[in-house]
């Protein structure tokens, strides 16, 4: 599988995860998500999915797929960008705040980042079964 196939598979997988998470939150709460698209200043963008409900004060399930160039201050911190500062990234972020102050909030995110050095990575394994 070449890097372009991996990027496409990754973006699709994050969209599927977003849809699964949103479905589970709706099943629990009965509310509905509002979606809003946003654009990245270079290329790409994302979609915010927000819900306010009875169980959850606020839930956000956000996905993004963006590309661009790291600035000079940051590119020295990221492997593979010293010679070519280009990047491509896709990810998902989830934040949930409950109505009850006795139930803690939670947050997680994960990203798949491609840099000039990424072509040396040959394995990308994504789950094939529903994990929620």
Question: Model regions: which residues?
Answer:
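Conserved small/polar residues in nucleotide/adenosyl-binding loops
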Residues: 122-128
């Amino acid at each position: 599988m070449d890097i372009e196939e991996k990027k496409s598979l990754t973006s699709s997988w994050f969209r599927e995860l977003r849809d699964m998470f949103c479905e589970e939150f709706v099943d629990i709460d009965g509310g509905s998500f509002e979606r809003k698209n946003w654009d990245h200043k270079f290329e790409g963008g994302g979609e915010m999915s927000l819900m306010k409900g009875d169980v959850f004060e606020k839930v956000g399930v956000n996905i993004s797929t963006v590309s661009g160039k790291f600035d000079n201050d940051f590119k020295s911190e990221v492997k593979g960008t010293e010679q070519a500062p280009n990047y491509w990234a896709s990810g998902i972020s989830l934040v949930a705040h409950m109505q009850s102050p006795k139930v803690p909030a939670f947050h997680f995110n994960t990203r798949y980042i491609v840099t000039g050095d990424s072509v040396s990575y040959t394995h990308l394994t994504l789950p094939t079964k529903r994990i929620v």
